[in-house]
Amino acid sequence: MTDSSISPSHPAGLSRALDNFLTRHRIGVWRVVVTFVLASLLFGHSRWDGTWVSPLLLTLGMLGVSLATVGRLWCALYISGRKNNTLVTSGPYSLCRHPLYVCNLLGILGLGAMTESLAVTAVLALAFALMYPAVIRTEDRFLASAFPEFAEYARRTPAFFPRLSLYRGESTWTVHVSSFQRNIADSVWFLGLSVVVESFDLFHDAGVLRAVVTLA
């Protein structure tokens, strides 16, 4: 049975339909999740505030956000101007097929840790786990149909979890400067969100905001 002949009622067809739905609506789902997080920060305060757990979570969060930002810039350096027309397999893309999403997970967990709430971090991690496997499968199907060499690339390169032994760099690399400049904003937004998260904490400490719930 070929891909084009799979019926929507077939299990594979249903799985693909669900993947496509989650891929199309992931931004809307994230908006709901972000609204929940902002409401939690507005009306809640961490139960770990004033304990040794608080600086630990903050440090881990800053580390995650920093790694995510640097990683996304590294990916943008390789992929800018080449997305959908060239199969990039070197640099970060030699470690795994979807390094941008690895960076997204690091940033999401980092932001969650910076809220100093394990519950908020768990919600963010769950949202990622529900949506991004579908996004990865959808993108893999597109790449397989667009690039004949993708099958060999997928055979040797893991989809998500990086394998450091596979790293292969380039001695020279042509950068599409205009595309890279456009992607810079997409690469550093985790830093902006980290400022927003910390602002809520400062407002609570200053008495500008009053917590009505305790965040675990």
UniProtKB/Swiss-Prot annotation:
Query: How is this protein positioned relative to the membrane?
Result: Multi-pass membrane protein
Q: What is its main location?
A: membrane
Which superkingdom, per the lineage? Answer: Bacteria
Keyword list (alphabetical) reads: Cadmium resistance, Cell inner membrane, Cell membrane, Cobalt, Membrane, Plasmid, Transmembrane, Transmembrane helix, Transport, Zinc
Q: Supply one GO CC term from the record.
A: plasma membrane
Q: Name one GO biological process term.
A: response to cadmium ion
Q: Which PANTHER family match?
A: PROTEIN-S ISOPRENYLCYSTEINE O-METHYLTRANSFERASE, PROTEIN-S-ISOPRENYLCYSTEINE O-METHYLTRANSFERASE
Known function: Component of the CZC cation-efflux system that confers resistance to cobalt, zinc and cadmium.
Q: What is this protein called?
A: Cobalt-zinc-cadmium resistance protein CzcN
